[in-house]
From Swiss-Prot:
Function per UniProt: Proteoglycan that seems to be implicated in diverse developmental roles such as differentiation, cell-cell recognition, embryogenesis and programmed cell death.
Keyword Membrane: yes
Keywords per UniProt: Glycoprotein, GPI-anchor, Hydroxylation, Lipoprotein, Membrane, Proteoglycan, Signal, Vacuole
Family of the protein in this entry: Belongs to the AG-peptide AGP family.
Segments traversing the membrane: none
GO cellular component, one term: aleurone grain membrane
Protein name, entry field: Arabinogalactan peptide 3
InterPro entries referenced in this protein's UniProt entry, alphabetically: AGP3/12/13/14/21
Organism expressing this protein natively: Oryza sativa subsp. japonica (Rice)
């Protein structure tokens, strides 16, 4: 039972972090010029990396 609560809390935290990353990304200054070489990380990329990492962590905790 406690592991399900921990799992639910971790999923909620991952969604919250992903949402906040999207909001922070949208509130940033205008994008640099294409010739500057600076690349911004999209919120979908952050979510694509964060969600499997949380799932892997939770999978290791359950064992």
């Amino acid at each position: 039972m406690a592991s399900r609560i921990l799992y639910a809390a971790a999923v909620v935290a991952a969604v919250a972090v992903s949402s906040l990353a999207g909001v922070a990304y949208a509130a940033d200054a205008p994008a640099p010029s294409p010739t500057s070489g600076a690349a911004a990380v999209s919120s979908s990329l952050v979510a694509a990396v964060l969600c499997p990492a949380v799932a892997l962590l939770l999978g290791n905790l359950r064992q």
